[in-house]
């Protein structure tokens, strides 16, 4: 069994889950436009440029969930996934996942986006919850505090979290050398460099340059 690792945002999804969630909550009147709209744009721009820290990136989006429980967010999350996410995961992306499933590979979704938002997205792709590696959220008394927990699953954190996942699942660290990882972003270069087969999917400019220099295949997915 080999591992097939997929980034979510910009790779399988035509868009960014965190950015879309923030926009969705602003339009729904849950978040104040004056407080969040410009900050959302700024965080996305800095993420793409590679100039924002994982702590700042993840903290901003965790803050959008503060003050409610999982149940308190359930209806909005369901509507968000149905209207903003499902239409943005195209047939080509789903076929790519299916190709690895047909090859009996174990499919993992590894994303900087938090676990609460990505659990139903992974399920919709047929990826079991134990095979989702996402940024964790802090809860107190069953309510999201607006902070993160554990190692953030972004940049070098993706390598750390994958190593922990391998250990928890009784798999040797050498499994990374046989794994395939699909990503669109230079933010994922630490994990792309760690796996045996890196594939750049609709890559940003920095990743496109790296892929060319490293001989990695570049995949343009019809959206």
Language-model segments: which ranges?
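Amphipathic alpha-helical segments within well-ordered protein domains
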Residues: 22-23, 62, 196
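Acidic/polar active-site rim loop that often engages polyanionic ligands
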Residues: 18-21, 57-58, 140-147
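Electropositive phosphate-/nucleotide-binding environments in soluble metabolic enzymes
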Residues: 15, 37, 51, 55, ...
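Short, compositionally biased "basic patch" segments
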Residues: 44-71, 132-137
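C-terminal cap/substrate-recognition subdomain and adjoining C-terminal extension
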Residues: 1, 75, 82-223
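N-terminal alpha-helical segment
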Residues: 36-40, 57, 175
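Metal-dependent phosphoesterase signature
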Residues: 56-92
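Active-site neighborhood of HAD-like aspartate-dependent phosphohydrolases
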Residues: 1-49
